[in-house]
Amino acid sequence: FVEQDPADYWRAVCEATAKLMDKTGVSADDVKGVVFSTQAMGIIPIDKYGNVLHNNITWVDGRAEKQAQSIMKKLGGKRIFSLVAGTPIMGKDVVAKLIWLKEEMPSVYNDAKYFLDVNGFLKFKCTGVAVAEYSGASSYGLDTKKKTWLGALKLTGIDMKKLPPLVKSTDMIGE
């Protein structure tokens, strides 16, 4: 298993931002926006209050290979799924990890309001708005042609309401 504490990401952002502002003399009033460039394909479950329920299961973590194979079988195999999502599902992909969480840590899965990646988590910490970017959503099960969550994901048993709304990386989130 390869996990990281999401509090470490937030602490690093806060410390780096404070150092940058101190070093440059820029005032918080002068900041017009913040952009994050982060690792993808991890999952950070948050509850309805925004509390983190479990460490980030990172992109390197392949614990869900059994679940990935089961999903591919249910959804018609590699060729059919790849045509819609653009890639077959593997054990490191978010959709497989969501099933793993549902099977192995049901209380975390059930208590989660949303599953966020690192980028979405940092945006949530800044704004209180839960989102996922199209650019990182392919491992969640994005229909790359329709730019929406794959309807076929319902066959996996994933609660689609736990997947955050999709946005472009250039969209403004919060104020």
PLM features: what roles do these ranges have?
Residues K48-V52, S70, K74-L75, I80:
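Hydrophobic or amphipathic alpha-helical targeting/insertion segments
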Residues D61:
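Carbohydrate-associated surface elements
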